[in-house]
Amino acid sequence: MTRKKTNPFVARHLLAKIEKVNMKEEKEIIVTWSRASSILPAMVGHTIAIHNGKEHIPIYITNPMVGRKLGEFVPTRHFTSYESTRKDTKSRR
């Protein structure tokens, strides 16, 4: 037997916010902490601010994003490169 495909996970509060905004004519930014929620076709065209651990990053949802997770589009880590403190390249004597 083959395995049954499970439904995509979407947080209930996020789904309620999407439905409420779809009823209105106006577009507004939807704020969420749910990075594990899947992107549904009902979310296309909305701007969702996703939490990255420090702040909310606004992401505009387009068609190719459907089926993926919200957290995939917001990086959580910031890379800082380490520069040498000395500017000269000559060896010290």
From Swiss-Prot:
Q: Which Gene3D superfamilies match?
A: 30s Ribosomal Protein S19, Chain A (3.30.860.10)
From which domain of life does this come?
Answer: Eukaryota
Asked whether the keyword rRNA-binding is assigned, the reply is yes
Provide the Gene Ontology terms for cellular component: chloroplast; mitochondrial small ribosomal subunit
Gene Ontology MF term list = rRNA binding; structural constituent of ribosome
* Gene Ontology BP term (one): translation
Taking the first listed entry, what is the main subcellular location of this protein, grouped into a coarse class?
plastid
**Cellular location(s):** Plastid, Chloroplast
- Pfam families on file: Ribosomal_S19
Q: What does this protein do?
A: Protein S19 forms a complex with S13 that binds strongly to the 16S ribosomal RNA.
The family note in this entry says:
Belongs to the universal ribosomal protein uS19 family.
Q: List the PANTHER family hit by this protein, alphabetically.
A: RIBOSOMAL PROTEIN S19P FAMILY MEMBER, SMALL RIBOSOMAL SUBUNIT PROTEIN US19M
This protein is called what? Small ribosomal subunit protein uS19c
Organism ancestry: Eukaryota, Viridiplantae, Streptophyta, Embryophyta, Tracheophyta
Q: Which gene encodes it?
A: rps19-A
